[in-house]
Amino acid sequence: MEDLLHGLNDAQREAVTTTEGFVRVIAGAGSGKTRALTRRFAYLVSEMGILPGNILCVTFTNKAASEMCRRIHNLTGDNDTGYINTFHGFCVSVLQEDSHAVSYPKRFLVLDNSDVDAMLRIIYEERDLSLRDMSFSAARDMIEIEKLKNRPDYYLDLIRLSLDELKEKYDRADTARDIIFYGYLWQEKKCFALDYNDLIVFTLHIFSENEEIRLKWQKRLEYIMIDEFQDIDEPQYRLMKVLCAYHKNLFIVGDGVY
């Protein structure tokens, strides 16, 4: 154990070894929070015998997640580093296992901006829109705002409507905004594709509608750690609350703002 605690100050040692219940650490840049997170993960595995696959550690960039995986591997020697990922990356793992609950295949497509632009090109060509009507950048922003704020139940169209029913909504749309939005949903459904916003709301929907799947993940994730807690948004906060509701072991790190 002393190897895992070597070089840590008193506050960091306390953060690493206080494993049960709700633990909040206020830490800014340069305070050694990444070291505390990685040592805490290694402590849970090496000293408490927790399987890496029963730990979720959320970071806010893929780069940070990769660096944390590397550090934990160096500490534990275990190639299994559990669920060390962004919220979106974790939701990909959930959906790859349980997308059948919303009648999506396990090999769904996760969209990036270039994929979205390719879909927009199809919509613009089909409906004679031009970039004067709305630029691709503005269209991407509009779609995100519609999904997050104006039409938060949009995902039900993707899940419950048939492809023909979505196409009918797209065909009936008569403003650039509605044409682009429903055309995009139709393209998503046609390709079994999900963007970053969809990943979280689909996961939340499955957890809300399917108690068996929700309990499976709640029981699996005995310990949850979240970095940069002050930056999480409302859907991410809801997801965190669902996941930690069973074991109630939550460790969060953030600056003094939260």
Model-derived features with residue positions:
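ATP-binding Walker
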Residues: S31-G32
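Conserved P-loop NTPase-based nucleic-acid remodeling module centered on helicase motor cores
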Residues: N54-D141
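Residue-level signal for well-ordered alpha-helical positions
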Residues: G28, R40, R71, L75, ...
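Basic/charged alpha-beta structural segments of nucleotide/phosphate-handling enzymes
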Residues: D117, R121-A193, E211
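Walker A/P-loop NTP-binding motif
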Residues: R35-I50, E67, R71, K241
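Conserved adenine-nucleotide phosphate-binding loops and their immediately adjacent elements
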Residues: M1-L4
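Conserved SF1/SF2 helicase motif Ia
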Residues: L44-F60, N249
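Conserved helicase NTPase motor core
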Residues: G7-T17, G21-V25, A36, L56, ...
